[in-house]
Amino acid sequence: MAEQTRRDFLADVGRGMLVAGVGYGAARDLGLSTAWAADDVPDSLTFGDREPLVRLLQDTAADKLLPMLVAKWQSGTSLRELVAAAALANARTFGGEDYIGFHTMMALAPAYQMSRELPSEQSPLPVLKVLYRNSQRIQEHGGHKSEILHPVALTDATSKSSTADDLHQAVLGKNRDLAEQHFARIAQRSADEAFNDVLEVVQDNTEVHRVVMPYRAWDLLDIVGREHAHTMLRQSVRYCVKAECGNHNDYARGGSRLLPKLFDQFKLVGRPLGTKFAEDGWVEQLS
């Protein structure tokens, strides 16, 4: 694996946050997701073959967890699988609504990336650190019994033609259940469309967690699998609905009002991209 420079890493992060912040189209397919009719919705959200490992991470006390995870790794369970199970356990438990919980989710992909750049005998260390924090917070939250995410029951309040505007209006109206239904309808058609449409809601303001969350969920799809895109992106829908109920949201909404004015003022729509290279000295001066 080629060594990644600090500049390359920051460039990757910057590109991802720009996509999440201003709503540009997704660059690749994120897979499909599942929603349910109201009359056949199951009680619990489950994850197939990964469910036993997900439950282990939810139900095991943090002080007993690490020896079990090391034993699993030594017996052949990959770090990738451990991180995937942790991401799904985190999403199902917190649903993007717990401050420590979603910060832990955001740390999972970077921890896995760091593990791939370490010598084999040291590679589990960054992953184990975040998995410990993840399970510790899940236990503080109540474990498996306190899960936030459940299968979405679809009702006549939404239709297969739900749009980004429908989702947006439900979020602005602080109607979490309706927003979840619209988003599930959208995700049934295309996870790529779901990602783009949730970004239209995210870009309403520039609050940092709101911007970073869908980018980190996107990043984790390479680990958990694109079939879990709906589960991972639902966290942003719920976060945005919750944000509408707080005063901080009005403070952070200024960007959504200013950005269109700047685009018009400087005629940025359709303008050719510049070719000036950001020299190290210029970057240093700017920062």
Feature locations, PLM:
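Mature, well-folded catalytic/scaffold domains that follow N-terminal targeting or propeptide regions
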Residues: A2-S287
